């Protein structure tokens, strides 16, 4: 029980405890996937450990069934070796992107997400239609959206952009990530134990905001 209590900051809930108990797994620990490098992963136990897939999971033909960032998994701990992921717990939701060149194929990029920050840059990237597509996907999966207008230093008429977003009736964060502006407001939209994701096209500032949130810049 104590180990599971330590996982609450990573999003472990009483509902997950009930799922875990119902599975009746023996000699395994719950963990959350926090990084995916393809052949290897990192998991929170809550301490961060290296992990790899069991032979069964590694041979799944449907790649959506293998662990993704945000998944809760059952792991077997080994001495002086990476933990072995034996099972993926049922997902509450997932976020996927289309695979380039394939009309119907999708690639899951994150699982069990609570809040999504949809980034639009106030330069050449601003697109209400792209935002609308993101919001549709989030609504299907019951993920709470927050709009982030980044690169606010690139315009003197922010209201011209915010007026176009009034129809959505969603929180809007005005940010200039390179200067650290708006980062604290983003943090305020994330409750303890919640999982957040940054969405947006290339170049809108996802990496910069991530680094600011992690204190790397």
What are these regions (language model features)?
Residues 38, 75-78, 90-94, 140-143, ...:
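Non-catalytic alpha-helical coupling and interface elements of nucleotide-dependent molecular machines
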Residues 1-128:
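N-terminal accessory targeting/assembly segments
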Residues 101-102, 130-131, 158, 182-183:
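Amphipathic coiled-coil/heptad-repeat helices and related helical stalk/stem segments
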Residues 108-170:
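Phosphate-binding glycine-rich loops and their immediate beta-loop-alpha structural context
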Residues 206-217:
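A conserved segment at the C-terminal end of the G1
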């Amino acid at each position: 029980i104590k180990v599971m209590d330590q996982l609450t900051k990573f999003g472990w809930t009483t509902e997950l405890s009930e799922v875990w108990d119902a599975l009746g797994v023996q000699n395994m620990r719950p963990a959350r996937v926090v990084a995916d490098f393809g052949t290897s992963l990192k998991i929170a136990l809550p301490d961060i450990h290296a992990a790899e897939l069991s032979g069964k999971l590694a041979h799944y033909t449907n790649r959506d069934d293998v662990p993704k960032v945000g998944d809760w998994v059952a792991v077997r701990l080994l001495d002086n070796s990476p933990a072995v992921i034996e099972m993926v717990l049922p997902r509450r939701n997932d976020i996927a992107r289309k695979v380039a060149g394939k009309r119907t194929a999708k690639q899951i990029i994150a699982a069990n997400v609570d809040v999504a920050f949809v980034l639009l840059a106030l330069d050449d990237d601003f697109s209400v239609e792209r935002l609308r597509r993101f919001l549709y996907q989030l609504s299907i999966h019951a993920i709470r959206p927050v709009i982030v207008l980044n690169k606010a230093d690139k315009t003197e008429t922010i209201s011209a952009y915010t007026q176009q977003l009034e129809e959505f009736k969603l929180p809007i964060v005005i940010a200039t990530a390179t200067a650290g502006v708006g980062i604290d407001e983003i943090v305020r939209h994330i409750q303890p134990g919640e999982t957040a994701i940054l969405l947006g096209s290339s170049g809108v500032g996802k990496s910069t905001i991530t680094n600011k949130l992690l204190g790397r810049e």
